[in-house]
Amino acid sequence: MSDCPFCLIAEESNENELIAVNRSAVAFFDKYPVSQGHALVIPKRHEANFFNLLPEEQLDLWKLLNEVHLALSDTFLPEGFNVGINIAETGGQTVDHAHVHLIPRYGGDVEDPRGGVRWVIPDKAPYWGTK
């Protein structure tokens, strides 16, 4: 899809932009990172919904995610990670090409990191304070 920014990255295979590549996925640094080393892993084939990818494409994404995790760990020395997939507009997806966020986390990057990805719905996140 020529107007999809992620397809352009995957098609051009610009080695300067890519962190890693396998048979059906590529990884690159997020253009608008929320932390140092924030990366995206995407399928080469255009598909908006992660769950509509072929099983082998999903597997390749996860394999590449593991490879990128090791590279980011060696390069940036984060203390933790968040992994996230936004699906559809309601789920927060802003680019209609499936992608997995790999977000390195560092001590002190937020006041209280408990709950991690649960904060996508702030009112429900602090479950540890309920009885």
Label the predicted regions.
Residues M1-K131:
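HIT superfamily nucleotide-processing domains
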